[in-house]
């Protein structure tokens, strides 16, 4: 199969859909991999890293879409990419169609075959391609929260982990799924007193988790928390 990796052009998206290691595996299995010029640059992968493992570099996003049978991306195509998607072309990325009617209609009109990462399921119902995104979201939420506790950001000047003589902040995470678990784990790892309010089965793992010397993740079953 001819696989194309375009450069992500959605605002603030710096990731690339395929690493050189991934490209190497695909080439080894007989596929042809085309990567747009500088597609991996913002993730620390120069064009030369792809060329070394047998991938080929194309100069523009148009070239990638026109050449590839399957497009592999990180985020959904934005409006300027809609006309580039061809009938019968496979597009593999995070789509989140439910929140974007224009994208949904554009992909239907294109006649392409869309494979959404977030809907890929294991036999047990878990979502293996959504879990990494949820892990990142949970951990980033605590970093962002800690930043907005700072005085220059309009916060109260609270240091999440405290210092000798000053108690650490108390963090309550509502929900104990993948996002909530990683948020609580991150908060505890930064020295905060972290608790989770959840009825999720993931909470079993949380209740056994501790970070550092005093920050312990506590499971509080709270079925009364409404949706």
Region locations from a protein language model:
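Glycine/serine-rich phosphate-binding loop and adjoining beta1-alpha1 elements at the start
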Residues: 2, 8, 77-170
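Alpha-helical scaffold segments in soluble metabolic enzymes
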Residues: 25, 70, 103-106, 140-148, ...
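Generic secondary-structure signature for well-ordered alpha-helical cores
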Residues: 28-32, 55-56, 70-73, 109-113, ...
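Short, basic, helix/turn surface patches
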Residues: 58-70, 138-151, 227
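Glycine-rich phosphate/diphosphate-binding loop of Rossmann-like nucleotide-binding domains
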Residues: 6-42, 152-207, 227
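An N-terminal-biased, well-structured beta-alpha scaffold segment characteristic
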Residues: 2-106
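Cysteine-centered motifs
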Residues: 197, 209-211, 219-222
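Intrinsic low-complexity, disordered N-terminal segments enriched in polar/charged/small residues
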Residues: 203-204, 214-216
